[in-house]
């Protein structure tokens, strides 16, 4: 019998070896604690006696739930701390970053007040038993190992600690050979998940399977009535599969049951495993109440799928799916789509979509991608796609691309085949986009260190658009565009001079269908034009240092290209460039390669910047104007009027960073007759406490042959109002049609362990005309609940704001981490 505290170091696997060595190995060195020679008189009944607690486990939980300002919390260096809305956080005895060694490799230190053999030959340790094993710690009042070293029994507030995890049980029975056993009346803490709970009994049925009976789980602060908790008759955790299964599960909010689920399958680690994902609930005015239950299928390490049965009360049953794959050396991709048979809100028509995307980086120089999209109708995405960033394109892209770059210095090339599905059946064939069957693009730039540079561009494509509705004569064929340019870049800190001489050419060959449609005679089916061009870009740089750094850059740009008649040339993909300050110094007034511009103009401009001592550009102002010496006779359409203006009006660009949080910008362009061609104003403010304000106004005058009218106001805000509450809104107002194309207003509450958002949204499909009597706005009211630690039941609001509110991600981060 030993009646003093003993301490030994040895290999610990299994627990029986530790106790047997402690009691029997005389060769192991011992050290004595300060209490050496004092016989333990601990009363186990007193140790088991519970202090009267307001809720089970109160004493245990409050011991490890500390204020964030506490020294032990500060030692975590802001890692693993709970959310900004929690005053306290869990701190377990062993840092979550500490990795425990395998039991058969770790060295252990065992201390106890008292050790002996009982009459049955069992090994017994009593009084403050501590087993410290390089990343693991066991504490108990008493530990007993049977004489066969097979069964271990620990009792008296048995604590097990390991990297970020801690449990306390009344008793533990464990089979050391099969690594199975039971833990009675256990409380547990997970620091990384900010979670805690209780289990009436924990059974380790195998080395990899643990079953919790009559168990609870919550990420709320410890208390008598947590904000929410999960209670289950049985929770089975399988480390081999990485999945957990609950049976007889109920969700409680403030001790009130609000949801019962007989069976639920969930992940317990980062592995992808088959199971049911979080259901999604919603409501809209044209779909009614809806429910989606995604099922994830982990088919193999390199591919998986998600199948989502979905029910919309006013439309019917729908099935959606997604398949993702990763090949060995041939890239990755995904396939997704959905089908809703006999939509009751859409004349009982079948609604469906299908999408395919594949990307393959063949090597450092070559890559390829393939994309295919299909939808049954133009309203599909606004009606049925639950994603807030769903497509609203009129034309769905289908393309294959082969890309080359980073090989030969200065060379980039692309070969692609591209076609489109036009969703709106009312669109005439003449207004549909051309298919490229195929298109080849090449850009090569080279030069020398002295500033001389050569550039070659080629764009060769066969454009095809069939005209089957007699809306126009067919105009399909091959277009070959070439450009060769030589420029000299002279740049110094004080000035720059960049002359450039280029030659551009277009060759067009109509195909047989177009020749037949237009009744072309021999020779007129082929068109060719060559245009030389000269440009000179020059400017000065002035700087003035003082309290603020000021820069002044006057700039002059001249461009000349002779007129070549291009009437009757097809326009495959070109549009008119928008007006801006930078566009004043660009000789190309068309986007695309269907026209070779005639030029003879001079643009003058000046830019001024003011920088403060921390580098903020407190003011940037630019003003410029173009002066034309000849009419611009080349137009996109033969019926377009020739531009005879002698000059543009002033083009102004202003911006200011008033401080690190507040930015304003304004742009405006006038025509020579004084009419305002376009203007926009934008204001951005992001506060340090989660507040945000955006305001924008955008106007475009209707100029035939150049630009369509556009007149809209966009505004958004996020504003904390009190404690954990904030309100948010977004509006896009179409002033041309005097209607709000989208309106969103919501309120959000965040607590330590749960959050709720309620918002209403009304919107029009981007492809619809609000003035049409057959078009009505879509309306939806959504309630979104997030149980932190379980994931959200819905995440649409965050996605909506992320895609519509500039700066949302940054401000949302400051809100949650404040």
Swiss-Prot record:
GO terms for biological process: Gram-negative-bacterium-type cell outer membrane assembly; lipopolysaccharide transport. Belongs to the LptD family. The keyword Iron-sulfur does not apply. Component of the lipopolysaccharide transport and assembly complex. Interacts with LptE and LptA. Together with LptE, is involved in the assembly of lipopolysaccharide (LPS) at the surface of the outer membrane. InterPro entries: LipoPS_assembly_LptD (IPR020889), LptD (IPR050218), LptD_C (IPR007543), OstA-like_N (IPR005653). This is LPS-assembly protein LptD. Pfam families: LptD, LptD_N. Its main location: membrane. Keywords: Cell outer membrane, Membrane, Signal. It is found in: Cell outer membrane. PANTHER family: LPS-ASSEMBLY PROTEIN (PTHR30189), LPS-ASSEMBLY PROTEIN LPTD (PTHR30189:SF1). GO terms for cellular component: cell outer membrane; transporter complex. Disruption phenotype: Non-essential under typical in vitro growth conditions. Loss of lptD causes impaired in vitro growth. Decreases LPS levels and susceptibility to polymyxin B, increases outer membrane permeability and hypersensitivity to hydrophobic antibiotics. Causes an accumulation of lipid IV(A). Deletion impairs cell envelope integrity more than the loss of LPS biosynthesis, presumably due to the accumulation of toxic intermediates. It comes from Acinetobacter baumannii (strain ATCC 19606 / DSM 30007 / JCM 6841 / CCUG 19606 / CIP 70.34 / NBRC 109757 / NCIMB 12457 / NCTC 12156 / 81).
């Amino acid at each position: 019998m030993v009646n003093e505290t003993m301490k030994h170091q040895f290999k610990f696997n299994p627990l029986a070896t530790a106790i047997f060595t402690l009691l029997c190995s005389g060769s192991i060195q011992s050290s004595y604690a300060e209490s050496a020679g004092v016989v333990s008189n601990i009363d186990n009944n007193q140790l088991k006696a519970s202090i009267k607690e307001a809720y089970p486990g109160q004493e245990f939980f409050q011991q490890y739930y500390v204020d964030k300002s506490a020294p032990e919390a500060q030692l975590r260096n802001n890692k693993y701390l709970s959310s900004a809305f929690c005053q306290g956080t869990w701190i377990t005895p062993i840092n979550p970053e500490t990795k425990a060694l395998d039991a058969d490799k770790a060295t252990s230190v065992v201390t106890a007040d008292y050790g002996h053999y009982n009459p049955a030959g069992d090994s017994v340790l009593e009084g403050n038993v501590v087993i410290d094993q390089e990343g693991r710690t066991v504490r108990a009042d008493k530990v007993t190992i049977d004489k066969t070293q097979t069964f271990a029994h620990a009792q008296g507030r048995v604590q097990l600690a390991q990297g970020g995890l801690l449990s306390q049980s009344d008793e533990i029975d464990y089979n050391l050979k099969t690594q199975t056993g039971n833990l009675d009346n256990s409380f547990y803490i997970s620091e990384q998940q900010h979670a805690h709970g209780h289990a009436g009994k924990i059974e380790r049925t195998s080395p990899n399977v643990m079953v919790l009976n009559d168990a609870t789980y919550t990420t709320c602060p410890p208390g008598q009535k947590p904000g929410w908790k999960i209670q289950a008759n049985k929770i089975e955790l399988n480390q081999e599969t990485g999945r957990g299964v609950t049976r007889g599960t109920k969700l409680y909010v403030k001790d009130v049951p609000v949801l019962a689920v007989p069976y639920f399958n969930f992940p317990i680690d980062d592995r992808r495993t088959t199971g049911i994902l979080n259901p999604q609930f919603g409501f809209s005015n044209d779909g009614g109440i809806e429910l989606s239950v995604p099922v994830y299928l982990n088919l193999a390490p390199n591919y998986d799928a998600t199948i989502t049965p979905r029910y919309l009360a006013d439309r019917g049953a729908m099935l959606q799916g997604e398949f993702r794959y990763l090949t060995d050396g041939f890239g990755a991709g995904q396939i997704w789509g959905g089908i809703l048979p006999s939509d009751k809100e859409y004349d009982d028509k079948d609604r469906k979509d299908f999408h395919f995307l594949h990307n393959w980086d063949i090597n450092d120089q070559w890559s390829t991608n393939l994309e295919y999209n299909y939808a049954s109708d133009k309203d599909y995405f606004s009606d049925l796609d639950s994603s807030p960033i769903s497509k609203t394109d009129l034309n769905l892209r289908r393309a294959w691309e082969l890309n080359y770059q980073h090989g030969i210095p200065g060379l980039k090339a692309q070969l692609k085949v591209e076609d489109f599905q036009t969703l709106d059946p009312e669109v005439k064939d003449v207004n549909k986009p051309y298919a490229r069957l195929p298109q080849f693009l090449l850009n090569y730039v080279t030069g020398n260190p002295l500033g001389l540079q050569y550039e070659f561009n080629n764009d060769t494509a066969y454009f095809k658009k069939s005209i089957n509705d007699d809306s126009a004569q067919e105009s399909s064929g091959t277009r070959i565009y070439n450009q060769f340019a030589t420029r000299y870049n002279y740049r110094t800190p004080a000035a720059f001079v960049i002359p450039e001489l280029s030659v551009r050419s277009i060759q067009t060959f109509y195909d047989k269908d177009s020749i037949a449609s237009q009744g072309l005679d021999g020779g007129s089916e082929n068109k060719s034009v060559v245009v030389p061009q000269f440009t000179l870009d020059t400017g000065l740089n002035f700087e003035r240092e003082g309290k603020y750094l000021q820069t002044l850059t006057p700039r002059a740009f001249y461009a000349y290209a002779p007129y070549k008649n291009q009437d009757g040339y097809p326009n495959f993909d070109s549009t008119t460039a928008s007006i801006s300050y930078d566009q004043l110094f660009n000789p190309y007034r068309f986007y695309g390669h269907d026209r070779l511009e005639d030029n003879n103009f001079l643009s003058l401009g000046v830019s001024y910047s003011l920088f403060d001592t921390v580098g903020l550009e407190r003011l940037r102002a630019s003003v410029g104007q173009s002066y034309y010496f000849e009419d611009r006779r080349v137009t996109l359409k033969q019926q377009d009027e020739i531009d005879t203006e002698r000059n543009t009006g002033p083009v102004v660009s202003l911006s200011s960073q008033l401080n690190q949080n507040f930015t304003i910008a304004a742009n405006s362009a006038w025509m020579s007759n004084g009419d305002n061609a376009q203007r926009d104003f934008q204001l951005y403010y992001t506060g340090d406490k989660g507040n945000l304000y955006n305001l924008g106004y955008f106007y475009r005058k209707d100029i035939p042959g150049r630009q369509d009218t556009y007149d809209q106001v966009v505004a958004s805000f996020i504003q904390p109002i009190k404690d954990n509450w904030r309100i948010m809104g977004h509006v896009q107002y179409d002033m041309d049609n005097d209607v709000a194309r989208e309106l969103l207003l919501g309120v959000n509450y965040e607590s330590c362990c749960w959050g709720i958002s309620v918002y209403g949204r009304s919107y029009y499909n981007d492809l619809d005309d609000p003035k049409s009597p057959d078009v009505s706005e879509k309306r939806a009211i959504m309630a979104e609940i997030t149980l932190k630690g379980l994931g959200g039941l819905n995440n649409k609001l965050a996605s909506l704001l992320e895609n519509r509110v500039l700066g949302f991600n940054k401000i949302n981060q400051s809100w949650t981490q404040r």
